[in-house]
């Protein structure tokens, strides 16, 4: 079963329609989880089911589109954070706090939707590759900051960065999902992994 959109919107009106359909899908998936249907999504968006099917063949395609947007938001937040850290140059604890805050926002703004995407989105090779690309980008940026703050040098920076990113992701998905204090809790957890560098 193909889980990609039927057609890509080219005109602004079509893009607006897709945006409305995906926001409606997000709301219905948040509320109903796996029980969500394309009929309820179309009704929520104010469109006919025929209009929905012009763009999405089934709800799995909508899940994939929502997941793609979530990953794109992750890249955007990471790029903005990288620029901010390059300008502000905080110490290591401040850097960890900045990363933890951005990671937490991605998971706590709409926690029920995030949980649905994590559990129900079809695992395609393209989707796995997209997630890996975001993970690798985060690891690369953390490694840059480890070197900048003098916490790690050489190949050790990549290893430590991978450990920190993996820990952050696992902690947010399995322990802190939906916790409004996730950023503070995650900051403490990540700093505790390297207590000798806490004050650098």
Q: Over which residues does each language-model region extend?
A:
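Alpha-helical DNA-contacting segments of helix-turn-helix folds
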Residues: 63-70, 134, 138
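N-terminal intrinsically disordered/low-complexity leader segments
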Residues: 1-16, 85, 200
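Short glycine/proline-centered loop/turn elements that form peptide/ligand docking sites
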Residues: 3-9, 35-37, 45, 59, ...
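Short hydrophobic clusters on alpha-helical segments that form packing/core surfaces
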Residues: 21-29, 70, 74, 103, ...
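Hydrophobic alpha-helical connector segments
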Residues: 65, 79-108, 160-164
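Helix-turn-helix
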Residues: 16, 20, 24, 28-61, ...
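Hydrophobic/aromatic-rich alpha-helical bundle segments in the mid-to-C-terminal region
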Residues: 119, 128, 147-191
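Hydrophobic alpha-helical bundle segments that form small-molecule/ligand-binding pockets
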Residues: 83-89, 109-114, 120-125, 135-161, ...
């Amino acid at each position: 079963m193909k889980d990609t959109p039927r057609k890509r919107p080219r005109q602004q009106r079509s893009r607006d329609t897709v945006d409305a359909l995906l926001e409606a899908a997000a709301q219905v998936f948040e509320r109903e989880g796996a029980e969500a249907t394309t009929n309820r999504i179309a009704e929520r968006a104010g469109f006919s089911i025929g209009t929905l099917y012009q763009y999405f063949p089934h709800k799995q395609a909508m899940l994939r589109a929502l997941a793609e947007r979530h990953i794109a938001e992750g890249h955007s937040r990471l790029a903005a954070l990288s620029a901010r850290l390059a300008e502000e140059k905080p110490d290591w604890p401040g850097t960890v706090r900045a990363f933890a805050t951005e990671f937490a926002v991605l998971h706590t703004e709409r926690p029920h939707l995030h949980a649905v995407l994590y559990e129900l989105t079809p695992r395609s090779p393209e989707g796995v590759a997209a997630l890996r690309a975001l993970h690798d980008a985060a690891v690369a940026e953390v490694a840059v900051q480890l070197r900048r703050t003098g916490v790690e040098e050489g190949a050790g920076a990549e290893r430590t960065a991978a450990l920190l990113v993996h820990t952050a992701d696992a902690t947010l998905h399995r322990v802190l999902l939906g916790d409004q204090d996730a950023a503070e809790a995650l900051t403490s957890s990540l700093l505790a992994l390297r207590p000798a560098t806490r004050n650098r």
